[in-house]
């Protein structure tokens, strides 16, 4: 039991130690991120102040320090590149910028990739910082890269500055650099990527003594002065008055420093406000232009819709008129054909056709006669024509001889039925059909010799 309890206590201690290490590492990472962001903000302010008096170039210590700080921020907890053997090789922040900033319009990525005097990734990253500052698009590049969270997550580990809340602060503080005109030489020694960048913290380290510590120092001096002499003479009263004067001077100096710092912050915020106002005015103007375009397009679409509807209505009217005209034409054509070809009862007495044969058949004049061949039928028709019209007997004889010659060698088949009879009326065709059904064959020569070819 004792061994078990000791083991449990040791396990609890071990777990507490692991949790303490984890909290300590997270605290160190947070302090590191905060230090880099704070130093970057100071560096931006010093660059803005220096730009009021001189041009910022590669020889400016403020710019060199800013470039080193930005390089450290973009390289913070950057993942290494895994090789084929499973090892991680160091990687530069340029590999991340090259992928994440390709969506920026009119970017300089391809230009930096094609530079002849720059070969290493670190040197290309430093050249990109200088080109982006000269183009005044550094803040836009950083904002676009941070918005691509998937790519950022792929290149950086947990706890990196670009993955935390400090990333938004970084993109905001870099906006102030758009008001500075930079001038860099992309062939200088500053692009040498053989050594890492080192941050100089000394311009930003100043010891400021608090008012409580100053008062405590004065009390100590008074105590020491009073313990050195028991008599209170005017000579012994002098040092406290001098210390009071020095303390007021120190307080005035501190107030002046705070005022200068506030004035610098005010200038930075005013510049940032001007940039935001310009961006807002541009956005408003673009919004107005887009709204006007939308209204114009809506109006054009409405007009086009009305025109199409009018065209549809007009086409429907035309289609209705054409249908009516077509129906009227059909009716007129039917009436014309009906009036032009008379009925069988109104035919002339001299017109001889198959209707006459049908009439004689019904009167049992030819009831006992049957024609066995086409020649017999044509002869009988010619005899009947001669008996009806004696004046045309001679002419009919000549035509009959011609038809007999033409009919020689032809087969008595139903295919010749279409050539029989007169087409003067529909009743002739119906009479032909009735003759066929009663096994009667009409001679095709009757039509040629019949005077009923033409309508009366």
Curated annotation (Swiss-Prot):
Phosphoprotein is among the record's keywords: yes
Keywords: Coiled coil, Methylation, Phosphoprotein
Biased composition (Gly residues): 8-21
Residues the record lists as Phosphoserine modifications: 215-216
Residue ranges of domain RUN in the record: 57-189
Modified residues (Omega-N-methylarginine): 13
Listed InterPro entries: Run_dom (IPR004012), Run_dom_sf (IPR037213), RUN_RUNDC3B (IPR047339), RUNDC3A_B (IPR047340)
Pfam family, one: RUN
Domain of life: Eukaryota
Region (Disordered): 1-26, 382-405
Coiled coil ranges: 300-325
Keyword Phosphoprotein: yes
PANTHER family: RUN DOMAIN-CONTAINING 3 PROTEIN RUNDC3, RUN DOMAIN-CONTAINING PROTEIN 3B
Similarity comment text for this entry: Belongs to the RUNDC3 family.
Subunit structure: Interacts with RAP2A.
Name of the protein: RUN domain-containing protein 3B
Organism, scientific name: Macaca fascicularis
């Amino acid at each position: 039991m004792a061994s078990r309890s000791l083991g449990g206590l040791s396990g609890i201690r071990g777990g507490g130690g692991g949790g303490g290490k984890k909290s300590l590492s997270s605290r160190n990472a947070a302090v590191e991120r905060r230090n880099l962001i704070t130093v970057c903000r100071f560096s931006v302010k010093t660059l803005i102040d220096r730009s009021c008096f001189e041009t910022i170039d590669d020889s400016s210590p403020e710019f060199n320090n800013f470039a080193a700080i930005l390089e450290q921020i973009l390289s913070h907890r950057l993942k290494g590149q895994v090789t084929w053997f499973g090892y991680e090789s160091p990687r530069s922040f340029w590999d991340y910028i090259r992928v994440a900033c390709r969506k920026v319009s009119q970017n300089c990525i391809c230009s930096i990739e094609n530079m002849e005097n720059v070969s290493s990734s670190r040197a290309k990253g430093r050249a990109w910082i200088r080109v982006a500052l000269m183009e005044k698009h550094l803040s836009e590049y950083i904002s676009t890269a941070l918005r691509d969270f998937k790519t950022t997550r792929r290149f950086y580990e947990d706890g990196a500055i670009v993955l935390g809340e400090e990333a938004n602060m970084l993109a905001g503080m870099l906006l102030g650099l758009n008001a500075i005109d930079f001038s860099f030489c992309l062939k200088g020694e500053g692009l040498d990527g053989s050594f890492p960048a080192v941050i100089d913290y000394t311009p930003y380290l100043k010891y400021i003594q608090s008012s409580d510590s100053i008062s405590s120092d004065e009390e100590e001096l008074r105590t020491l002065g009073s313990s050195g002499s028991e008599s209170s003479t005017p000579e012994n009263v002098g040092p406290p008055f001098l210390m009071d004067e020095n303390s007021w001077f120190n307080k005035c100096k501190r107030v002046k420093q705070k005022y200068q710092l506030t004035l610098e912050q005010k200038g930075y915020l005013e510049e940032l406000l001007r940039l935001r106002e310009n961006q807002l005015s541009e956005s408003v103007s673009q919004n107005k232009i887009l709204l006007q375009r939308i209204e114009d397009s809506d109006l054009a679409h409405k007009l086009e819709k009305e025109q199409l509807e009018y065209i549809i209505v007009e086409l429907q009217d035309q289609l209705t008129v054409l249908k009516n005209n077509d129906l009227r034409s059909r009716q007129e054509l039917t009436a014309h054909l009906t009036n032009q070809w008379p009925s069988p009862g109104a035919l002339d007495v001299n017109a001889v056709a198959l209707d006459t044969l049908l009439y004689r058949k019904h009167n049992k004049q030819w009831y006992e006669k049957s024609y066995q061949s086409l020649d017999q039928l044509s002869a009988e028709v010619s005899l009947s024509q001669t008996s009806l019209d004696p004046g045309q007997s001679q002419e009919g004889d000549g035509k009959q001889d011609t038809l007999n010659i033409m009919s020689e060698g032809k087969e008595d088949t139903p295919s010749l039925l279409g050539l029989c009879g007169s087409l003067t009326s529909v009743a002739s065709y119906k009479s032909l059909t009735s003759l066929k059904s009663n096994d009667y064959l009409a001679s095709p020569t009757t039509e040629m010799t019949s005077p009923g070819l033409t309508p009366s």
